[in-house]
């Protein structure tokens, strides 16, 4: 492998993947601006889809995560669900 591919491989971890999904969910919840439009917009359908995807990953990876990865995923899901519920009420 080239040095560039090795560096990229080291950057791609389960935690960085989960954090990227978290960022996407925060954009859909209107917490962060859309990177294309630079505007904050709420899209509850996409937010729920992203939260459901994270929940599915939690179930599918159960028993295979490090303690830190598991805590990160639990924390992210908790925070996203709270924000989602506040918006739908």
Placement of each model-derived feature along the sequence:
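Acidic, glycine-enriched active-site microenvironments
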Residues: 61
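N-terminal intrinsically disordered, cationic/polar leader segments
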Residues: 1-52, 56, 67-89
């Amino acid at each position: 492998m080239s040095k560039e591919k090795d560096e990229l491989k080291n950057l791609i971890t389960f935690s960085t993947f989960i954090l990227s999904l978290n960022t996407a969910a925060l954009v859909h919840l209107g917490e962060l601006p859309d990177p294309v439009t630079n505007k904050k917009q709420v899209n509850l359908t996409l937010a729920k889809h992203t939260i459901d995807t994270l929940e599915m990953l939690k179930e599918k990876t159960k028993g295979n995560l490090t303690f830190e990865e598991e805590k990160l995923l639990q924390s992210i899901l908790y925070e996203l669900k709270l924000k989602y519920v506040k918006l739908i009420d």
